[in-house]
Amino acid sequence: MESSSFLTVNDQPIFINQAVKYLQASGKLAHFIGDILRQYVIEQEIQTRYDIAISPALTEQTIIDFRLKNQLNDPQIFQEWLQKNVTDYATFYESIAFSFKLEKLKVLIAEAKISEYFIERKIFLDRVIISRIVVDNREIAEELQTQIEEGGSFEQLAKEYSLSEDRMVNGMMGPVSRGTMPDQLRAVIDIANPGQVVGPIEIEGRYGLFRVEQFLPASLEDTQLQQALQNELFEKWLVEKIQKLTVKLQMS
């Protein structure tokens, strides 16, 4: 491969083969190549599809909004901004258009699998807000359970007796993924009602009383969750595509 200039630093050219050596020395070559392969796969896919048309008006309006938001409406100031960011209008325009195409591609890649993927992941996506009191022997746990049943304050007992750090916030653990709970805890939490205290349950040599505060079931109607799942499916698709590539690093 004929070596060509990649950068000029203090009027001294840095050729591609030297740039690669710098990346190797810094341990960043693999990441650099990975970024190139990602972009290669994405652009190849976009070029071969006919369902990713983006309206020029959308791109132009996005640029107008960007300029207004960042006080770049003056042509001279905008031109200076482009130069400062080592780009020009045509390249900037293409980058905005590409971002829309990428988001549309993610939707198209994920749409056939997202419902099934959601079901597979649901146990990890469902969350429960719970509070706990953790002690180091069953007898204490049972005594605390009795006190709670007789009207004792769960919050106060958590502050006084719990060994977990969340005792400072009345034992409140916050939202916990069902999929990350120990099996024995999830089994009783799943059939409990909000406000109910369950336990004692032995977990890693300690005993816990758990109060269910609120169930937070996941839903595909949640646009933020839907976006996250689309991104996960897209990344899986992208990794599979990259793994099938034949890549050779050529240096003169």
Feature annotation, model-predicted:
Residues 2-252:
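Peptidyl-prolyl cis-trans isomerase
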